[in-house]
Amino acid sequence: MANLKIKIADNELVADGDHKALSEYKASFLDFVAKRDAFLAGERFELTEVPREEVIAENPQPAPNVKDEVVVIYDNAGIPSIMRRFSLMRNNELFEGGSTVEHPAFVIGGEVYDEIYISVYPNCNINGKPYSLPGMKPWTNVTIDDAANACFSKGDGWHLMTAPEWGLLANISLKNGTLPHGNTDCGHYHADHSEKGIPIESGSPYTLTGTGPATWTHDHTVTGVHDLCGNVYEFVRGIRFKDGEIQIATDNDAALPETDLSKNGSGWSSMAEPMFVDTSHGVVRFTKEKVENDTYEGGRWKDVECSEYTEGMKELAIYPGEPEVFCGIDGTEGERLAVRGGYWGGSSNYGVFCLNGSNPRAYTYTSIGFRSAYFKRKTDN
């Protein structure tokens, strides 16, 4: 058992976890980011000795039209999370055939937001609240509803990462040629075993958050969003498969606690162009006509059949952006929730475009975790 101690301003955060190691680099970077944030907020710190600043500066930067930054955001318990800021983007900036409409990740409660914040790391558990910190054991074995409630409990604007937010990161990664690698083979990247993370304990196939190389991020830089491929699947709020139909929350309204996404909740609706799943022919098919399914189907995206991937599907990364990765959906009667990204044991099946739509609402597993996201309400001026 080890403690993670991080000094921020005059306080010291002590987080207990069953991890056995913490990357010195990640700890230094976290300390630097915390000090920078406090400095910008008016605190005085000596920032002359920035850990590995030259390495960070030398990393390839995102495309010029992608404006983002790593920041520290504190929740209502006064504990920080390391977050990545993403500025407003439109569909035509993200994928082929996209219109000039704002990507839905930036439309919340009918209002367009200039920026949103996404956890840099899959979240860990500190006193029942989720946090984005490096070198921690991912919080798993939780239902999607409990994960959502834990995120909402952090305060106004905090929420479980949504389907549009995941789609945003997947599309950015594909467009910029930086599809993330990750822990897809017992702590290593299946295609290059020199890429590895720190195991949560000796012999474990799971890795501590953010301990892989820069290629394990959405933009292949050390300051990117980590671990979107492999290690643990991640819940996303605001998408489900109900009696074979793809149902979603409007825009990014899944970020709002008042959006009722319970089993019979009023927050669910069909896509703008309704889309159904056909699993009756041995492959996953997307169709605009409802069919009767009696089975689950799964395979690689390259084998999925669809006459046309709609703009709404592309917004959520429901298309073969990574042809070799897994897409599996239960199209039978009932409700199935989605997880994304894959876990530690799937080899080439897993990546940021991986989609598994087969789990009932109450399902929990050691290989399913989550991360929080945040937006600042426009009334918070």
Task: Give, region by region, the residue ranges found by the protein language model.
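Extracellular interaction modules
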Residues: 19-23, 112, 364-368
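Compositionally biased, non-globular sequence tracts
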Residues: 1-48
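Extracellular adhesion/carbohydrate-recognition regions
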Residues: 56, 66-157, 243-286, 369-372
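Short aromatic-cysteine micro-motif
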Residues: 101-228
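Charged, compositionally biased non-catalytic regions
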Residues: 41-69
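Short secondary-structure boundary/capping segments
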Residues: 174-179, 240, 249-251
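C-terminal, surface-exposed recognition/capping segments
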Residues: 167, 195, 200-205, 211, ...
